[in-house]
C-alpha cells in the first residue's frame, strides 16, 4: 500500500483508493495502525500528522507528503521505493513505453547498434544510475527519479539462446504489462545502496555471500567486503572436457563486445579485492573505445590508464600508442592489468590471420607474466585464443558473453599462478570450453562454508536456501551468527513442502519457528526496508518466491512498535471479512466457537482470543513483516516498551487460545503449513512463558450480585471469576492482587441476557463483559507466580440450579456487584471485599 498525505481533499476519484481523515482523538500510532489496515492500495491521508507518516515509513509502508496535483498523479499511477531518510522517491514507472521508448542505465548500450533491432519507431534512452538523469523531469517538493529501465530484458536476452532481439523484447514487454510488478527485484538496488554503506560504517569485517551480476556495481566502493560465490572455472577443470572444433555461433544481433570487456574488468577488480582489500589502478592495453568506463565511474571512482592508437574517451590517462613488452616497467604496484590486444584482420587470409592471432596470444601471455613477476599486489586479465598452449593449472578462465562465440577467451592470473605447475592444453579442449561454458557471474570467489564467524557481519541475500546446502547447517549458521542479515525462502506452500522448485534448482523452505534466536528480528522484505531508511509502495505477494529476512544483532530489537511491528496485521482479515465472508464478524465468531465459547453476544468487543496472534498465524503469508516470535518473547519477559497507540497486554492463555483457533482454521482450509506453524508457535509460547494450570483447583474467586433477574434454587448465585491452585500460605498474595485490582474489578460492566444448560443438571446464566477483566487478573497472578485458571477456555457464567431447567431469554440486564470474595472449594470464605 501507499499513503499519500494531503492537506486538502481532491475532487478526482481514483481506482483502488480510499480517503482517511486523521482522527485527533487518537494518537499518531493508533492513526498509523488504522491506516495500515485499510484495504485499498492507495490511501489519501487528509489533515495528516508527520509523526504518523514517520511511523508508517519505519514500518516499511511508503508514506509521502504530497504538495501538488502533479505529485499526486505521479505517485498514484505507479509503484515506488521511498528513501524516507533523504526524501528521495525512486519510481518504478514503465509509462515511458507510451513514448515508444525503452530505457537503460548502462551507457555502453547506447554506443551499440541496438537501435536497429528495437520495435519499429522506438528509441533507446540512457537515464543514468538508478534513473538519476530523470530527476529533471520532476519539479517536486521531494527528490524524484524513475529507476525503471529495460536492462533486465537486455541482459536476459544476452544470456538467452535467442537471437531475434525484437521478438524477445516484444514478448518481454507484453509479459511486463500483464504480470504483477516484481517490486522487490526493482527496489533491491536501492536497498543494497543503503544497506552496505550503513553496515560498513559500523562493522570492520563484512562478508557478503552469493552476489550476482546485478550487484556488480554496488560493491565497487567496498573493496574490504569479503565476497563468496560459486568459485572460478580454472585450467585444471578442463580435464573433464572432450575436444571440439570452432563453432562460430552468433549470440547477439547487436554488438556486445563492450559488455564482455566490462565484465572481464569488473571480474578482475573483484578478484583483486578478495586478495588485497583495496582499490587498484586499472591499466588497459588495447582499450579503445571502452565506453563502459563511463558506467563504472558512475558508481565508483577509479583511475583508468589506457594504451591504444585509437581514442578511449572515458579513461583517466590515455596513451594514444601501442604498448610493448618493454613498457611493462611503466606499470605500478597495486594495480590490475587488462590485456585485450588484437590486431584487426582486414583482408588477411585466415591461415595467416590465425598465425598472427596465436603469436599475439603468446605475446600477451609474456606481458602478463612479466607484469606479475615483479612488484606486489597485481592481478592480470589477458585475452587468449584457442590454441595448443601451456597455462598454470590454477589460472582462472573467463568466457563472458560476446557477440559471437569464436576462438577468444580470457584468463585471470595472479603472482601465485605464474609460479605454479603449468599444464599443456590442446586447442580442441579450449574450443570445448568456449563452445559450452559461459561465465555467468563477475564474482568468482570461492563458495561460502556454512560456519558462524563471531567477528564478522554476514550478509547473505537470496543465497543460502538452495538445496545443495544442508538445511540444518543453514539453520545452525543463523542461530549461531551474532551479527548478520540473512534471507531464507519462506514456506508459503499449503502442503508444508520442505523444498520448492525455483528455476532449474530447488530451495529449502523455512518458517520463523525453525530458528532459535535472541536479539534478532525475522521479518519480510518490506519490514527489513523500514529498518534501513526505506519504505515501499507494494508489498510482496503472499505466494511465489518470498523470503524471510533475519537480522541478527540489531539495535532495533526492543523497539517493538517501531520496526517489524503489527502495522497491517488485520489488513487481510479486513479484505476477507468485508467482501466475501458470511459476516464481517466471521473472525470473531470463529475464534470463540473454535474454543467452545458459545456466548457470541458482543463477540467483536469481548473476544476470548488474541486477534493479533490469530491473524499473524492464519494470514502469515500476507503479514509476515510482523515478527510474531519477537512480540511473544518480549511480552513473556516483560520488556515491552511502546511509544504510543492503544496498548493491550495479552494474557499468555489468550495466545494459546489463538493458536488453537488457528489450528482449527488450518484444518478446515487443509493448510498443513499453518497447522504446523500454529502448533510450533503454541510450543514456543509454552516454552517462553511458565504457564501452570489450576485443573485440580482448591480455591476460587467469586462475585456476588445485588440481584439476579432469574429464578434460582442455589443458595447464593455467583459468578466464578476464576479458580486457583495455591497453598494456604499464598492466600495473602492472592488477596494482595485482589486489593490492587479492586477498583477495576468493581468497575467491570457485567450483564446477562439468557440462561442455558452448561451440562446435564447444571443450569446457568450467561455473563458478558467479564473477559477483559479476567485476562488482566490472569496477568497479575501470572506475574506473581500464582496458578490461576484452567487449561480449558474460561466461560463466564452464573450457576442458578443443579437441575434441568427451561432456558429463558431476557433483555440485556446490567448486574450490580455486591462483593468479591476468595473461597476454598468445599470450604470457607477466606477473604471478602465490598465496594
Curated annotation (Swiss-Prot):
It is found in: Virion. Residues 171-245, 429-555 are annotated as: N7-methyltransferase activity. CDD domains: capping_2-OMTase_Rotavirus (cd20757). Residues 556-692 are annotated as: GTase/RTPase activity. Its EC number is 3.1.4.-, 2.7.7.50, 2.1.1.56. Residues 246-428 are annotated as: 2'-O-methyltransferase activity. GO terms for molecular function: GTP binding; mRNA 5'-cap (guanine-N7-)-methyltransferase activity; mRNA guanylyltransferase activity; oligoribonucleotidase activity; RNA binding. InterPro entries: VP3_Rotav (IPR011181). It comes from the Viruses. One of its GO terms (biological process) is defense response to virus. It catalyses: a 5'-end diphospho-ribonucleoside in mRNA + GTP + H(+) = a 5'-end (5'-triphosphoguanosine)-ribonucleoside in mRNA + diphosphate; a 5'-end (5'-triphosphoguanosine)-ribonucleoside in mRNA + S-adenosyl-L-methionine = a 5'-end (N(7)-methyl 5'-triphosphoguanosine)-ribonucleoside in mRNA + S-adenosyl-L-homocysteine; 5'-triphosphoadenylyl-(2'->5')-adenylyl-(2'->5')-adenosine + 2 H2O = 2 AMP + ATP + 2 H(+). One of its GO terms (cellular component) is viral nucleocapsid. Multifunctional enzyme involved in mRNA capping. Catalyzes the formation of the 5' cap structure on the viral plus-strand transcripts. Specifically binds to GTP and displays guanylyltransferase and methyltransferase activities. Has affinity for ssRNA but not for dsRNA. Capping activity is non-specific and caps RNAs that initiate with either a G or an A residue. Together with VP1 polymerase, forms a VP1-VP3 complex positioned near the channels situated at each of the five-fold vertices of the core. Contains a bipartite N7-methyltransferase domain, a 2'-O-methyltransferase domain and a GTase/RTPase domain. The C-terminus contains a phosphodiesterase domain that degrades the 5'-triphosphorylated, 2'-5' linked adenylate oligomers produced by the host cell in response to IFN stimulation. Interacts with VP1. Interacts with VP2. This is Protein VP3.
